[in-house]
Amino acid sequence: IKGLTQLLKKKNAYNVVEKHLSKYKGKTIAIDTSILLYKYRYGSGNDQLSHIYGILGKCMSFLSNGVIPIFVHDGEPPEEKSEVLSKRTDQRTKLNNKIEDLKIQIREYTTDSDSEDDGLGKLKVSLSKLEKQVVRVSQIHRKEVFYLLKLLGLPNFVAEGEGEAGCVELQKKGIADYVYSEDMDVLTFGCTRFLRASNKKDYYTEISLNDILSNLEMNQDEFVDLCILCGCDYTSTIRGIGPKTA
């Protein structure tokens, strides 16, 4: 949801209280695995094991604090999201084309000059920045994490649709106490207790949907309408309407 975090903070819709993971000892937390994969793959460059190390670290963190994790993986995306997925594919293609162009310029620059100067240095910096923007999460990465968790004996499954929606479904059924994600979209699915990672190691910000609805003086349906007006992956935006005007 575009600008939702900033909007909720501006309206003081929830209290930002950070808790150490140990405070959730004995609790079950459904984890949006896709979010973690992108987090660990971001800026990893040629490191093909960053997602493995990252997931292992997360498992150790949860288990050592007595927390039971359930890893939920993305299934097939809903049809409503096809347009935004197509746009993202186009953006990645354009970004990859820019990267290839820069690589060609660097090769030509190196061939024409025996020494590095400011021009070549700037090209390399630009290339590095662009490469970090291309987050590569392949089906191989997803399968590796799935089988790693299976070998560790930890509960993990593929949702029917998106992983975040699957996490919320587990909470609604009483299987999970909390949902861990970095995506505020879980609130629109009706996630009542939502955890986001803090900048401090093993600390999390707990967000209560009931607090948000109470402070905004809205019910769940009205909140979902607000999120749609802000802009989401499932519908086109309305011209002139966004987080500030919704």
Positions of PLM-derived features:
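Non-catalytic, usually N-terminal nucleic-acid engagement modules in DNA/RNA processing proteins
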Residues: 1-104
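Extended two-metal-dependent nuclease catalytic cores across DNA- and RNA-processing enzymes
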Residues: 86-246
